[in-house]
């Protein structure tokens, strides 16, 4: 299930990041399911592979799988923009073409959600910017600051019983909401200052991974 911040971020352009096996696909599937149950939208997902099958509820959902329905994320995104979806889920932003098309889609009014293999919000911004040639990077910073609304960087922790046995896993998330201060840091290339902004941004729904880990330990115990 989604918490309040997660539900709010469903109506915005967001990225979910973390290492392999950190639950990124599950988080995005929860967001898609929330939208599907509550809003009348056209949702298009591009995945490798399709891990969660979504039946149309209030929304109409179309799912595309790499290798079966399309050759690449970039090709699928190009086709997607011709199908007039309201929401596009990009399973993984792997290369310049995919990232560029995703930013363009967000700038043209589509809600775009996607994943990257990064471990923090600041690393996510750096990874996106660094994909582009030096001469394009400032323009991409501006575009990203205008279109990005949130980054969720997550990890999964083992949940232990009182006798030390594993009882599943619990998720901890760093949450960066792109308010005016964060947007300025993106535009100015000051990603090193993002952690401090996240620390002081609790009133906007932000939290550091350390705070999330502390809350997870309380929840586990």
Where are these regions (language model features)?
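Short, flexible helix-loop junctions that flank or precede catalytic/ligand sites
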Residues: 1, 7-8, 12-217, 221
